[in-house]
A protein has these predicted regions:
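Ubiquitin-like/PB1-type beta-grasp interaction modules and other compact soluble beta-rich domains
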Residues: 1-89
Length: 90
């Protein structure tokens, strides 16, 4: 077991979550580590740690080591999840 934000205890593997654009602004940092068994576990922990992040996660593309994944994707120790919110522009 590992401790996450605010002393929460979670089981699973250690994963780095890297935030981009508006997700980075809401989280207030570039990246952080959480533990979980699948993408849903880790993103749930991130959303619980940062007010407003849940809305951004709902519209973001999530990459696992550069590959788009769904919430049920299992995780391996040491992987990186990237949160890519939609980008505006043209």
């Amino acid at each position: 077991m590992t401790s996450g934000p605010a002393g929460a205890t979670r089981t699973g593997v250690n994963v780095t979550v890297r935030y981009w654009a508006s997700a980075r602004a809401v989280a207030g940092l570039d990246s952080e580590r959480f533990a979980g068994l699948d993408v849903s576990d880790v993103l749930g922990a991130a959303a619980a740690a940062h007010t407003g992040l849940s809305d951004i996660l709902g519209v973001s593309t999530i990459l696992l080591d550069g590959r788009a994944v769904t919430a049920s994707e299992p995780l391996s120790e040491g992987v990186t999840l990237e949160v890519l919110p939609p980008f505006a522009g043209g």
